[in-house]
Amino acid sequence: MAAVIAPNFSSQKADQERETFIAKLNALVQLAWQNALLSNSLHKVVFDFKKRRVSVEQATGEKDSQGNAQFVPLERTYMETSIEWPEYLKIKNFFIEGFDEMQRAVGGETQESWFFVVPGGMTQRVTINATDTHDMQNNGRAAKVGLVLNPFNAQFTIYDTFKK
């Protein structure tokens, strides 16, 4: 009798797909960071939870009737200024400065949230917790992913557990 042992490559593929998305997210946030420094203007990184889309917007210098800064989508010919995240990544928590934006909508779902990148290059404190349903663990649950944004270099660090 012979036995064949085959490695499980499906988990590696899920890791690669997830890491590719996170690399794109880091590139997008880095673009906002660089442009905020170069243009000396406020930027925001917008997460549209309904469309599963992340985009960068730049302040116009104008204010609305309530005194809030007006923003327009950042346009670049050489880089993506928005990306979609895959359906299998389910955002569970979206902490900005310690407050979970996913809990903001009373009786409904949070549709959109964002964090700022100031002209000096600093970002707000951001932590994103998600599950990856393409990466099922031995216990039958989706893999946990924690992303913590470094406010000084505008890059997410990846953890294999939820963070706060």
What is each PLM-predicted segment?
Residues 4, 10-14, 20-23, 34, ...:
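N-terminal helix-rich module
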Residues 27-37:
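Phosphate-interacting basic helix/loop segments used at nucleotide- and nucleic-acid interfaces
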